[in-house]
UniProtKB/Swiss-Prot annotation:
Belongs to the RecR family. The keyword DNA repair applies. GO terms for molecular function: DNA binding; zinc ion binding. Keywords: DNA damage, DNA recombination, DNA repair, Metal-binding, Zinc, Zinc-finger. Gene3D superfamilies: 3.40.1360.10, 6.10.250.240, RecR Domain 1 (1.10.8.420). A zinc finger (C4-type) spans 59-74. CDD domains: TOPRIM_recR. SUPFAM superfamilies: Recombination protein RecR. The keyword Zinc applies. This is Recombination protein RecR.
Length: 204
């Protein structure tokens, strides 16, 4: 009879497999490393995960991650509330912030349209985006909406859908310039390239 790992160890391995790019072997290596060489690090990791899961929420205005009802970017009086940049993820927002060239606000979709995966307009909060872009109580109407979804097929489809939706309301909509490679994701593009793509954006 083959010996099985302890139940709690197996549970740890299964939990680690939820991380992107982590398969069974990698998860097993991580679990054994933490238990064998870095139990204090494992405790810190567990505490940090619990703190983030319990303490992080979505900003009621832009949908990004925050510990407050309204995030620091949305509550910053020095940001241009009428200039709105739409991104897929909080990581994409961070990349644009690192360019130090954009002083508007954001809306974070938390995904992109993917009908085959059951992800439609509702799942990426396009109703909230429309409200943010048009409702004066939320900072609207926007003077310009920059669609900064990734240049993947799903990202392009999402950009087209958002562009048509907002232009139908009379809003100016622009798209990042093609400095970002086709198929590229903002999270993996250098800040200089993103800065140029924002500055050279084209009107849809």
């Amino acid at each position: 009879m083959r010996a099985a790992p302890p139940t709690s160890l197996q549970a740890l391995i299964e939990a680690l497999k939820v991380l992107p790019g982590v398969g069974p072997k990698s998860a097993q290596r991580m679990a054994y490393h933490l238990l064998q060489h870095d139990r204090e690090g494992a405790r810190k990791l567990g505490d940090a995960l619990r703190g983030a899961v319990d303490g992080i929420r979505h900003c009621t205005r832009c949908n990004t991650f925050t510990e407050l009802e309204i995030c620091g970017t949305c509550s910053d009086p020095e940001r241009d509330a009428t200039l709105l940049c739409v991104v897929e993820t909080p990581a994409d927002q961070v990349m644009i912030e690192q360019t130090l060239t954009y002083r508007g606000q954001y809306f974070v979709l938390m995904g992109r349209l993917s009908p085959l995966d059951g992800i439609g307009p509702k799942e990426i909060h396009l109703d909230r985006l429309l409200a943010r872009a048009t409702d004066p109580e939320l900072g609207g109407p926007a003077s310009e909406v920059i669609v900064a979804t990734n240049f993947t097929s799903e990202g392009e489809a999402t950009a087209h859908y958002i562009g048509e939706m907002l232009k139908a309301r009379g809003l100016k909509v622009s798209r990042l310039a093609r400095g970002v490679p086709v198929g590229g994701e903002l999270e993996y593009v250098d800040a200089g390239t993103i800065a140029r793509a924002v500055m050279d954006r084209r009107t849809l």
